[in-house]
Amino acid sequence: MNIIDHFEQENISKLTANKKIPDFEAGDTVKVTVKIIDRSIEKDGKEKLTERFQAYEGVVIAKRNRGITSSFLVRKISHGEGVERRFMTYSPIVHSIDVVKYGVVRRAKLYYLRQRSGKSARIKERHIPIAKTKAAKA
């Protein structure tokens, strides 16, 4: 491991210390909560910063694993139009990532979904078995 990889691993561990990034792939439906900072100017001329969170839910159509510059592309349909947004995986702007549904696909990049609409754009759901515990048996 060279010095750049070591430096990247240190930064990734610092950025993920207070948040958990789940394992997800292309085809999974995720809900990404993003931190948005609004600037407003008050009557007395002072600048006021307000922080809020916004959820963005859609299908992951591409994932790019490149160390600290890793990102993923999420596509959703909003008011009949397809909207895509790329999120940096380790960005401090990304507050949380939740996997809503796991999908079954046979490709790493799902760019073909851009030309599809309706039923042909659906992705089958992959069911993850729940670990059997003593409480589940009782």
From Swiss-Prot:
The keyword Ribosomal protein applies. Coiled coil: none annotated. One of its GO terms (biological process) is translation. GO terms for cellular component: cytosolic large ribosomal subunit. It holds the Pfam family Ribosomal_L19. Gene3D superfamilies: 2.30.30.790. It comes from the Bacteria. The keyword Ribosomal protein applies. InterPro entries: Ribosomal_bL19, Ribosomal_bL19_CS, Ribosomal_bL19_sf, Translation_prot_SH3-like_sf. Keywords: Ribonucleoprotein, Ribosomal protein. GO terms for molecular function: structural constituent of ribosome. SUPFAM superfamilies: Translation proteins SH3-like domain. This protein is located at the 30S-50S ribosomal subunit interface and may play a role in the structure and function of the aminoacyl-tRNA binding site. Belongs to the bacterial ribosomal protein bL19 family. This is Large ribosomal subunit protein bL19. It comes from Rickettsia felis (strain ATCC VR-1525 / URRWXCal2). The gene is rplS.
